[in-house]
Design a protein with these regions (language model features):
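N-terminal phosphate-binding or glycine-rich loops at protein starts, especially the Walker A/P-loop
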Residues: 2-52
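Short glycine-rich or small-residue beta-strand-to-loop segments that form or flank ligand, phosphate
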Residues: 4-12, 73-79, 105-111, 137, ...
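Short, ordered loop/turn segments at secondary-structure junctions
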Residues: 10-12, 39-45, 79-80, 112-113, ...
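Short glycine/serine/threonine-rich phosphate/pyrophosphate-binding segments
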Residues: 14-24, 46-47, 90-93, 113-121, ...
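Accessory alpha-helical/coil subdomains and C-terminal extensions
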Residues: 36, 98, 106-111, 117-132, ...
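Glycine-rich oxoanion-binding loops at beta->alpha junctions
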Residues: 49-105, 114, 153-155, 167
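C-terminal non-catalytic interaction/assembly regions of soluble proteins
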Residues: 253-407
């Protein structure tokens, strides 16, 4: 019986995706895997037979600890879209030939919606051809939009970064009494979980952002400007957190009102959304005649491992370990989800869910977690998100900067 396993990473990276890699690797070794292979650049790299032996690369405790503290995808990523196996089996024949060649008994793919699509297709094809290879999805996305899981590893650390940096921006903007507006653009194409996390900047030492704009609520320029004008009557500095995916009622992205449409990736998604904060800043300046500034947090949101949430790191590691356990228990076609079993104290456990019910679906922010005017989130959102950013991980510093591990 085959006793080797292989792990891949796909889609956009996070601050803790490598913690999940470490979790799968350590658990697979403990459960008896002879060799643990890694795909270089996901399924696309595997199709080119680009593999590494993780047993050789991660053979000591320091390597594992550095891996857990290293942002981005250690193995490299891709956005390769497998065709439907019923329409074109060519890549599947190649992949399953490689699984046989390397005596693979389990495949783990760490990623978001599109990665779960890959696992769903591989498990479906495997069932059709009678393969014994098990396929398990390991969730990852800062967008927090995967279904059937309380939240997704990667979100907590991104939320912690957003809340921290926005809190510092709020402090910076308060130095002058000149009337001004600062608009911070935060990632989130269709779901506003990241922008909503801006509320976590609030506390007894900070009011947090004045407005939060989410993709779930259509943008109304007149209503927005009236609200900003109202705020400026009572305070000099207004802070706005806006999702990059905010759209008008007709579905037009605000960023498209200031830039031409960008390229699409293999899954049909616009590769980069950028310009929402610029549009809003210009609108405020032109209509309200006040100083305004646009800030884009951009990719910094997903790679700030120096500000990672310990809760997030630990949960990312746990879902990796649970994925290995599920595969060695005979499960296939599953994704490891997080299930919240306690609020006070906060606690989540892992469970395996049907990946077919996750792939290509998106979880939006519940409308009852959004304020009636559509420009803030409620206390329920904060109660949900606050535990996910708690506690810190100390980087390993060398010569004044965090030490990372790489291929």
């Amino acid at each position: 019986m085959a006793k080797n396993v292989i792990i891949g990473q796909s889609g956009g990276p996070t601050a803790v995706i490598n913690s999940s890699l470490a979790g799968v690797y350590k658990a697979a070794c403990s459960l008896g895997a002879d060799k643990v292979y890694g795909m270089k650049h996901g399924i696309e790299g595997l199709l080119k037979e680009e593999l590494v032996e993780l047993n050789v690369l991660l053979d000591d405790r320091l390597s594992i600890e550095l891996l857990k503290r290293t942002p981005s995808s250690y193995l490299g990523s891709c956005r390769y879209k497998l065709p439907e196996p019923e329409a074109d089996s060519t890549p599947y024949v190649k992949l399953f030939t490689l699984f046989d060649k390397y005596d693979i008994c389990a495949v783990f793919y760490i990623g978001g919606n599109d990665s779960m699509d890959t696992i769903a297709k591989l498990s479906r094809y495997g069932a059709q051809v009678g393969s014994t290879v098990r396929f398990i999805g390991v969730p990852k996305t800062i967008d927090n939009d995967l279904c059937l899981t309380d939240h997704t590893p990667g979100y907590g650390s991104a939320a912690k970064y957003i809340a921290t940096i926005l809190k510092e921006v709020i402090r910076d903007s308060s130095v002058s009494d000149i009337r001004s507006v600062t608009v911070a653009e935060i990632m989130g194409r269709h779901a506003g979980w990241l922008a909503g996390a801006a509320c976590l900047a609030g506390g007894d030492d900070c009011d947090g952002p004045d407005l939060i704009l989410l993709p779930e609520v259509p943008f109304e320029p007149d209503k927005f400007l009236a609200k900003v004008d109202e705020l400026q009557r009572v305070k000099s500095n207004v802070i706005i957190a806006a999702s990059e995916g905010v759209k008008t009622a007709d579905g037009t992205y605000l960023c498209d009102l200031v830039s031409t449409a960008g390229q699409l990736d293999a899954f049909g998604h616009k590769a980069i959304l950028s310009g929402t904060s610029r549009y809003l800043s210009d609108l405020i300046h032109d209509k309200l005649n006040c100083k305004s500034r646009a800030i884009e947090f951009s990719t910094l949101q997903r790679c700030a491992s120096h500000l990672a949430s310990r809760t997030d790191v630990n949960e990312a590691y746990a879902v990796g370990g649970a994925a290995a356990a599920a595969a060695f228990a005979g499960e296939t076609g599953k994704m490891i989800a997080l299930k919240r079993v306690s609020e006070y104290p906060y606690q989540c456990i892992t469970e395996a869910v049907d990946v077919q019910k996750v792939a290509n679906l998106e979880k939006k922010v519940p409308l009852d977690w959004i304020a009636p005017d559509g420009m803030q989130v409620t206390a329920a959102f904060e109660e949900y998100a606050r535990p996910l950013i708690l506690d810190e991980v100390t980087p390993v510093y060398v010569n004044g900067t965090p030490r990372h591990i790489h291929l």
